[in-house]
Amino acid sequence: MMFDEYIAARKQGKKEYKAKTAAGEYPYLPALESLVPDANRLVQYPLGLMEIPVGLIAGTKTQGRQNSFAPDFMPLLDENSEFALKWSSLYRAQISEGFRDPIKAYEYLHRFYVLEGNKRVSVSKALDIPTIMADVTRLMPTADVLAQNPAYAEFMKFYNVSRIYDIDCTWEGAYFEIAELMKLDLEHKWPEESRMALRSAYWRFSIVYRELSGKMPELPIGDAFVIYLRIFIRDALRDQPKNIVTRRVMSIRKEFMTEKNTERVGLVETSDEALTAGSLITKTGTIVSKMIPKLSYTAKNPLKAAFIYDDMTGDSSWTADHEKGRLRLEEAYGGVVATRSFEGCSEQSSFEEAVREAAEWGADAVFTTSPALINDTLRAAIEYKDIKFLNCSVNLAHQAVRTYYARMYEAKFLTGLIAGIEAAADGTHRIGYCSDYPIYGTIAGINAFAIGAAMTDPLVKVYLEWESRRDENWWWDMVDRGIHVMSAADSVHSADGSDAYGLCYVERCEPGEGNDLSETCRIRNLSAPIYKWGRLYEIIVRTIIDGSYNADLVDRKDQATNYWWGIDSGAVDIVLAEDLSGYTKQLVSVLRRDIVDGSFSPFDGELRSQEGLVRTQSDMPLTSGDIIMMDWLNENIIGEIPVIDALTDEAQVTVRYSGVGKTKRESQS
């Protein structure tokens, strides 16, 4: 009998009621008018008739019918009541023919609140029906509420182009990533085929994820779905059998665990930390190896490491530097390590072909040298589980892929010291600084440079430009301003063919044809911060050889591992011009030593941004995470962090994966 279903539903409702009461929480259905007292004064946008997810129905619009339901919409009134009779009648109607009329609901911050049809929602939840037809009106949050809920502001753009309500993500950037994975955007209406494919993929995933709830971390399904799409986008949009979806979801369980962890990235900040991870240190300081199996690599059976570049070594100084690092790695191990490189793998097809060749070659490790390759690297790591995959980036959280980067801000601080001395000596008190991409870690380098310059010239101003900005002609802009001290490209191997690299002094410059500055300018090189990728690769490979790569200290179970090494590990350093003053060299040497032994950081003491005070002298020091995530500029910097739309197409690819929040956020407003 249908009354039996009501009795069962009421039993569930009473259980929920008791649980909420015991927890000191409100035991009835939430009402929007109670949650948002000024709800009736908010701007209303009729969205019309649509199918909405029952799981996103959070309560009722008004306060009148709250006490009839528990918070989960299960009924509470006596089974002999008129309410129970009507509920059972609706149950029969749904079983036999379905509901004829849509409910009326208001949507606020991606949740629905019912004006008419509470019992129909209750019946739908009792029957575990995923969707229900509704006539929906959106209540537009106020500007301050939207500012506190950037993910919802982004969702509204997503809904406008996709007309999909089902996917509920909690973090900013998720909907932009979905659009990018779909090779679409949040500005133009999506084709019906794409819209239906994504919605179907989400429902296939959500059914499996709910069924595996006991084996999965408590991660919002929408957030988990984005991770799933990153890895399986090519097949996820097809109609896949449930067993295949289940197998794929289980294969990336660790990625879900990492996403759930509030401290998603675990930094390994010294080479010693990595190299002694598989050892015990006795009370006397003696290092004793743990029982970690060491692999026997020889010249006849070498460790094989593949390097995948998104660019060509002849076209990119960044790629050329990594290629030098690869060759240094081979040289350091004298035949015990063999390497191969694959250039020009920016497209998914060429990347996958490179990984396939590397796997057939027998690669033990694969290094991918651009943040833009992270998703391709992640997909490969899931497929080729016996190969260790590492990506050159910082603050990207994936269990299957380790990341590595250098603390370039340490060397930038030292070059800033020299720049300040030169700017004070020529009386201009001005320095030009050209950065590449506004990605994690880069802003710290800019600020450290500016702080170093201010320590030797308190009057100095640093003029910031971005090489990756569209139609940028930063060099001549600086020359026109009368700036002589410039921080240019970090590498000697300049893509533009000039000899303007590192920190330099422009003694004379006249406009000429082409980009070869050596023909039109007289430039004196002062110093250069340098990445020493060979040293970094040498240390990582050593951990693989001695077995410490998989030690618990480094191989965290619910965190991504990020090697972030500085001058003390030999991963970054500074080269000084021979004709620099001996006093300048001594100052740099002293502060370099203090950075290495940990007694000094460029970000000690009071810090002031363009907007005001960041840190007082007595505040806790900035954490490494704070330094990586910087999205502010020091007070003596003239310039800004560009929005993503102002960057070249090539730069936008990298910034979408690894850009600082300010860059991505402002472009979405």
Please give the residue ranges for each predicted region:
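Short, charged/polar connector segments at secondary-structure boundaries
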Residues: 1-111, 115-116, 126, 171-183, ...
